[in-house]
Amino acid sequence: MREILHVQGGQCGNQIGSKFWEVICDEHGVDPTGRYNGDSADLQLERINVYYNEASGGRYVPRAVLMDLEPGTMDSIRSGPYGQIFRPDNFVFGQSGAGNNWAKGHYTEGAELIDAVLDVVRKEAENCDCLQGFQVCHSLGGGTGSGMGTLLISKIREEYPDRMMLTFSVFPSPKVSDTVVEPYNATLSVHQLVENADECMVLDNEALYDICFRTLKLSTPSFGDLNHLISATMSGVTCSLRFPGQLNSDLRKLAVNLIPFPRLHFFMVGFAPLTSRGSQQYISLTVPELTQQMWDAKNMMCAADPRHGRYLTASAMFRGKMSTKEVDEQILNVQNKNSSYFVEWIPNNVKSSVCDIPPTGIKMASTFVGNSTSIQEMFRRVSEQFTAMFRRKAFLHWYTGEGMDEMEFTEAESNMNDLVSEYQQYQDATADEEDEYDEEEEQVYES
């Protein structure tokens, strides 16, 4: 019931994805061979079919599709700790690589492989009793995750128009750049995500580094540490689908509560408690502490500061044994104390949900998803970098050589700029704006 089909694409997506499966397997007591050996069968198995398909002999197989345009990352997943748990047919890869080129992923190399991926997606979807939606892990800076990822999203959109499409998208970082053409790839991807995705959880390596460095006190964070943070959040977002809870939410409820205008579906995510590995057993958590940490700007996993904008909506998902009353009080408290950071024309704009089962090794945890206008900082930054290069037509021949047209770049650029100004418009909007317009008009007539 209510299955979610997981797709991971490109190097980044596959690394995040495989970490996510480790976390989910751990929570459901599934060992690396796919057998159940947990300690509380009724809870762990009750809704295990959200993410797993039960195969013959009681093995649980992830509903995951893994795609890439080169075999490297897939090979390392296959030889990794949980490599044997995936269905072998669900690895779909090419040999050529996309070479950080969005056009290769979207139009040439990726387009050749996409039908093979869609076949696997169809096969998995047919195995579902009542498919709720898709979750896609990818980065927007490279070629495969961004180009082929968005191609797959638009194809799935065509075929399953009424299913939720949730993405975990790693944006290029402000200071740490992996490739020069990141702004191009990211802008072209956002152009697609605005139209074809329902909910985008925005992640960013630099913000994740900061969390690892500042809060978790890791001196040299590895991508493994970063991906661990992401997977904790991913697990939190879907926990109320997978475990019984007092206040449940699913992907659609999340969307209905978080998206006031269809294009503004890019969310900041946060997670609490963030503790360094050694000090986990020393913290006693209370709901107020969780709430405080969860709303902390330093906890946001993308490089935008929520204090520079206002929240249109937000959602807080708590896990563990706690009273719903206390959760409600804390959420209300946050809204009352920081009312200037919430738009006043959406009253009670924070949704909370409570799930009884905490993550492994912690008593309580919470996941935060917020729709804040300050995320425009991120789009604005990428857009400026895009414009700087596009004005000089730098690196453009790599894209036009794959058959792209400059027009598409111009469209993507203006779509991104529209998005920024939409966020700005709602940030400045007030509840009694209509009256102001009337007054202005009257003055015009008088003069």
Swiss-Prot record:
Principal location listed in the UniProt entry: cytoplasm
Alphabetical GO biological process terms: microtubule-based process; response to light stimulus; unidimensional cell growth
Residues that hold GTP according to the record: Q11, E70, S139, G143, T144, G145, N205, N227
Region annotated Disordered, chain positions: 420-447
Annotated residues for binding of Mg(2+): E70
Organism domain of life: Eukaryota
Composition skew (Acidic residues), residue ranges: 430-447
Alphabetical UniProt keywords: Cytoplasm, Cytoskeleton, GTP-binding, Magnesium, Metal-binding, Microtubule, Nucleotide-binding
Any one cellular-component term (Gene Ontology): vacuole
Entries under PROSITE patterns matching the protein: TUBULIN, TUBULIN_B_AUTOREG
Cofactor(s) listed: Mg(2+)
Pfam families: Tubulin (PF00091), Tubulin_C (PF03953)
Function, as annotated: Tubulin is the major constituent of microtubules, a cylinder consisting of laterally associated linear protofilaments composed of alpha- and beta-tubulin heterodimers. Microtubules grow by the addition of GTP-tubulin dimers to the microtubule end, where a stabilizing cap forms. Below the cap, tubulin dimers are in GDP-bound state, owing to GTPase activity of alpha-tubulin.
Subunit relationships: Dimer of alpha and beta chains. A typical microtubule is a hollow water-filled tube with an outer diameter of 25 nm and an inner diameter of 15 nM. Alpha-beta heterodimers associate head-to-tail to form protofilaments running lengthwise along the microtubule wall with the beta-tubulin subunit facing the microtubule plus end conferring a structural polarity. Microtubules usually have 13 protofilaments but different protofilament numbers can be found in some organisms and specialized cells.
Record protein name field: Tubulin beta-1 chain
Gene designation per UniProt: TUBB1
